[in-house]
């Protein structure tokens, strides 16, 4: 046993007295009544706020969603296997917030912005509330700048502007994610920060998407937020709001951002699961009554801010999956009514080898030509009409035996325009080359070519135009000189 001198004992006691604090810390503490299926019912937290974070005895975080007269219904941010009935729960006095900032660029994180890519921790200087109000009417300006996707069919006929919400909708395996990833890849030199939110997907699918973005050099300006299929329903519900909060941080700094929610059907299903377990009354298709508000409060955060607020923008590309092409189901109709247009992908077109499988007839952009450069507006005006007439004639020609010359020519033109719009995945086309391809298609330069010769011909034309001063000229303005430049190159290769 160590012998202590009296003066040592007295100095230790003196130190203890000096360090003694009379501060009293108040904690609101409750008790777990019931736990299971990612839901906990807590008794005794009378002063808790809706959406407040709760801390359980095992360190699991929960969110208070149901405030009832005798208990609080909370969703758990984890499996909650170590939470026992009768254990203690503390209220934190805080609403959910996540770290934001440029430190997240190039990283893959979960719905709570914890890194899951094995590249070490992330130290950010700022945080932001997961749920924050959307910009008001005065804070916005109308969409006026184009956001090029690099996909000819979209940039020509269904243009997307910075600050727009454009829905990508279609059955499973029709190329919805491919369009979203191509759009991210095309932002390489455009100074746009991209956030890709994967909700309820297989981990292998997310890994493949991250790998593709990394291969194309797109991870330098991209943040991936993922809540996989095996994650808790609460994390799948939160992931889109986390993505929006990350993008909002950059938007309010005056930067252009692009957010992809892949897909909101899975988020709605996770929210339905949570609501039913919390015993909220079910409505149509067993979804709770506020499922419209679930998506509207998320998508309304996308905006083009006015000059006083820095002129930043958040463009949202939500994805919704349909069953057997049924666009009139509950979630699809909800999201269609919230967004500024939709790109409809058809499984019939996909199976017929037309990729991207965009059904031009029922796809629409409500922003329209305000989100196009002047040259594209000039050239692509006739394209949608020609394709619509072709679709109508093609259906009619299956029943007619003999067709007149004009009808045959129109059918031939439509087939060649379809070839122009075909595009392989992860190979976005610059806007100036798209204009040249469409100009060749609508002005009859491809009419005499066989269908299999269309793509090789266009690729030769594009290669030559790249080396001329055509790209910079066509971006500034459509003029007779630009048109003559195009005609010279087309006639040279048409011989």
Swiss-Prot record:
Enzyme class name: translocase
EC number(s) given by UniProt: 7.1.2.2
Compartments (UniProt record): Plastid, Chloroplast thylakoid membrane
UniProt keyword terms in alphabetical order: ATP synthesis, ATP-binding, CF(1), Chloroplast, Hydrogen ion transport, Ion transport, Membrane, Nucleotide-binding, Plastid, Thylakoid, Translocase, Transport
GO molecular function: ADP binding; ATP binding; proton-transporting ATP synthase activity, rotational mechanism
Keyword match Membrane: yes
Main location class: plastid
Topology term for the membrane: Peripheral membrane protein
Binding site for ATP: 170-177
Protein family according to the UniProt entry: Belongs to the ATPase alpha/beta chains family.
Record text on subunit structure and interactions: F-type ATPases have 2 components, CF(1) - the catalytic core - and CF(0) - the membrane proton channel. CF(1) has five subunits: alpha(3), beta(3), gamma(1), delta(1), epsilon(1). CF(0) has four main subunits: a, b, b' and c.
HAMAP family per UniProt: ATP_synth_alpha_bact
Official protein name in the record: ATP synthase subunit alpha, chloroplastic
Organism: Cyanidioschyzon merolae (strain NIES-3377 / 10D)
